């Protein structure tokens, strides 16, 4: 909600490119109900967000446990630091493909779906490197070599800046968890992006 003391603009954050709803201050007495969402108590939306957050947490837990088993030294502090960073990156990618940040729904899923399980690790290393590079900083032949990878946008903010995180090898089970359970079967756009 934005106000210039004459008009209120109500922007729907679920549709950031949509036109705002406009409410005149002079009409507030008769149109106040249009601002009811500001004082919603115990709404279905909040309950739904909590339910989605719990489901997302369970999925991340399953993914975390499956990844942890693949590390050579699963108790080492460096391993746990890498695993945490990897999980955040994967959740971001899952969110970004569902929320349209990558430009096309299922883009992350489609990038990995035809990669054999043994090649997922390398594909993620390459993807994370590309996500951290502005288009003008990327290999000028990337689009020729790998158009699917070149199509990913630059993600600012440093989430993908550290290339030294350890990514373990993937198994068929782990690939299935990531692509089927986490990507195909769950809509990450329903979670709050503030977790990033």
What is each model feature region?
Residues 1-18, 87:
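Nucleic-acid nuclease catalytic cores
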Residues 3, 32-196:
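Preference for the N-terminal adenyl/adenosyl cofactor-binding alpha/beta module
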Residues 12, 21-27, 107, 182, ...:
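Short, solvent-exposed coil/turn linker segments
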Residues 16-42:
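Glycine-rich phosphate-binding loops of NTPases
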């Amino acid at each position: 909600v934005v106000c210039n003391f004459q008009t209120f603009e109500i922007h729907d954050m679920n549709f950031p490119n949509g036109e705002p709803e406009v409410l005149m201050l002079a009409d507030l007495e008769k149109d106040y109900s249009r601002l009811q969402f500001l004082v919603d108590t115990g709404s279905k939306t909040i309950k739904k967000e909590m339910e989605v957050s719990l489901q997302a947490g369970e999925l991340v837990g399953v993914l975390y446990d499956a990844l942890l088993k693949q590390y050579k030294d699963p108790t080492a502090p460096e391993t746990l630091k890498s695993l945490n960073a990897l999980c955040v990156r994967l959740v971001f990618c899952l969110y970004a493909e569902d929320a349209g940040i990558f430009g096309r729904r299922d883009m992350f899923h489609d990038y990995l779906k035809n990669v054999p399980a043994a090649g997922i690790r390398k594909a993620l290393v390459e993807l994370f490197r590309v996500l951290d590079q502005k288009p003008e900083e990327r290999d000028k032949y990337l689009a020729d070599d790998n158009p699917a990878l070149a199509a990913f946008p630059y993600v600012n903010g440093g989430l993908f800046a550290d290339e030294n995180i350890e990514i373990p090898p993937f198994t068929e089970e782990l690939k299935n968890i990531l692509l089927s359970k986490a990507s195909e079967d769950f809509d990450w756009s329903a979670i709050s992006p503030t977790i990033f």
